[in-house]
């Protein structure tokens, strides 16, 4: 079906999806501008919807403000704290949802006049939960998700005599396979040892446990999950299996292009980035697998929000419905930008069965769909971003300074417990 037809049907369907619809917006007679702040590649997805939007709202211009990922979230942090230069629609990555919700500057979309709670069953459960605060306010509507996956260079594994099962059977096996790969090809197992930590701490979290802090306010960073993550990261560093390369750096993309990084633990969306701009010349060399040791975890995801001080909330909500509640729009974004859909309706589409040329013809979308269905819904906590920084700093001390793991995690716990105590007062 042509893209234009998809978008026309998409808008028509999504405006009927809730009871809010056009009645809330009313007739738009005067010229208005709807501003949307986003980062790549959500900005391109939003821009692709403008032509169809204009057919319904010819007097509403859509201005998409695009910034690099970090710059976008820095700008939105400032805008929310000062209540100035706010867009009508703000796209937020999962890791920032709790931080932005903390200040109370985002609309609760779960209640009237938005009522997204009525559509809860249509979303991947863990994604909907990620946009919900501990108090039950739905401050962000999921658009795309990041089921965790292991991407690996099939050519490098073959050269080293390593099989996929060697990487995935266990985390210890993953590291051992890395030793063989490094010896045979010179390639690092991972870009940075922290990549292992990041996935392990997000894997197989129990309901109600939380990432860093549970529902009762108990700090979890000295639990077995974190000890295991730190031990594995340290083992990777001791075996010289990481290049100490930070994600999104020039060295990172060059490592993918030159074949000096054999695997990457990430969200499924990375396969699209590798294909589209990070390392398109490596088409056919990559494969995808589930995470080692039967782990399932979420890594990233994009959400739509409305600031409380936004000027055009009704129109903003119409746009958000169009982008999140329409199977056609979600599928279009999946096809064009590899934005894995948060809407369950789309998961039944035949597109999931199509081979991915970049991954050597593998039908990896089925793999990722299975992972998405097995990921536990994890409550967000407003101290998650702070906890992430504290834990990351302690890991650096372990990797770079030889700090004892239990001491590092105990120090991280003490710092976080003080923050939790202050928050409670």
Predicted regions and their residues:
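Short, well-ordered beta-strand elements
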Residues: 31-41, 60-65, 88-89, 139, ...
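Glycine-centered hinge/linker elements that transmit conformational signals in sensory
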Residues: 177-180, 216-245
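Extracytoplasmic "Venus flytrap"/periplasmic binding protein-like
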Residues: 52-123, 159-161, 166, 255, ...
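C-terminal lobe and pocket-closing loops
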Residues: 114, 273-281, 294-393, 424
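Short, polar/charged alpha-helical segment
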Residues: 41-61, 391, 409
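Conserved C-terminal helix/tail region of periplasmic/extracytoplasmic solute-binding proteins
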Residues: 158, 164, 370-425
């Amino acid at each position: 079906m042509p893209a234009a037809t998809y978008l026309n049907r998409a808008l028509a369907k999504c405006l009927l999806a809730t009871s809010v619809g056009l009645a809330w917006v009313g007739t738009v007679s005067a010229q208005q501008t709807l501003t949307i702040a986003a980062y790549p590649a959500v900005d391109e997805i939003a821009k692709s919807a403008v032509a169809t939007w204009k057919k319904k709202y010819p007097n509403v211009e859509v201005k998409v403000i695009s910034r690099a990922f970090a710059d976008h979230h820095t700008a939105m942090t400032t805008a929310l704290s000062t209540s100035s230069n706010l867009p009508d629609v703000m796209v937020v990555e999962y890791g920032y949802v709790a931080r932005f919700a903390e200040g109370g500057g985002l609309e609760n979309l779960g209640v009237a006049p938005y009522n997204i709670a009525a559509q809860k069953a249509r979303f991947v459960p863990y994604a909907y939960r990620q946009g919900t605060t501990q108090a039950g306010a739905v401050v962000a509507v999921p658009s795309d998700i990041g089921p965790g996956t292991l991407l690996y260079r099939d050519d490098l594994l073959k050269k080293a005599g390593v099989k996929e099962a060697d990487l995935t059977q266990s985390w210890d096996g993953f590291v051992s396979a890395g030793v063989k790969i490094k010896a045979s090809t010179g390639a690092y197992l991972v870009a940075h040892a922290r990549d292992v930590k990041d996935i392990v701490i997000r894997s197989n979290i129990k309901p109600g446990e939380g990432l860093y802090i549970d529902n009762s306010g108990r700090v979890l960073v000295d639990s077995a999950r974190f000890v295991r993550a730190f031990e594995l990261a340290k083992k990777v560093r001791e075996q010289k299996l990481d290049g100490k390369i930070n994600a999104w750096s020039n060295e990172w993309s060059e490592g993918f292009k030159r074949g000096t990084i054999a695997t990457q633990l990430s969200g499924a969306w990375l396969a699209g980035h590798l294909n589209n701009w990070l390392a398109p010349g490596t088409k056919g060399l990559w494969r995808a697998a589930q995470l080692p040791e039967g782990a399932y975890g979420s890594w990233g995801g994009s959400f739509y929000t409305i600031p409380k001080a936004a000027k055009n909330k009704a129109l903003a909500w119409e746009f958000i419905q169009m982008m999140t509640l329409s199977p056609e729009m979600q599928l279009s974004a999946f096809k064009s930008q590899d934005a894995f859909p948060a809407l369950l309706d789309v998961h039944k589409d035949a597109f999931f069965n199509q081979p991915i040329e970049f991954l050597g013809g593998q039908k990896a979308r089925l793999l990722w769909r299975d992972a998405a269905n097995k990921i536990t819904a994890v409550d967000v906590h407003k101290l998650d971003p702070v906890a992430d920084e504290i834990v990351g700093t302690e890991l650096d001390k372990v990797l770079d300074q030889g700090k004892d793991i239990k001491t590092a995690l105990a120090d991280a716990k003490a710092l976080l417990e003080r923050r939790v105590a202050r928050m409670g007062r």
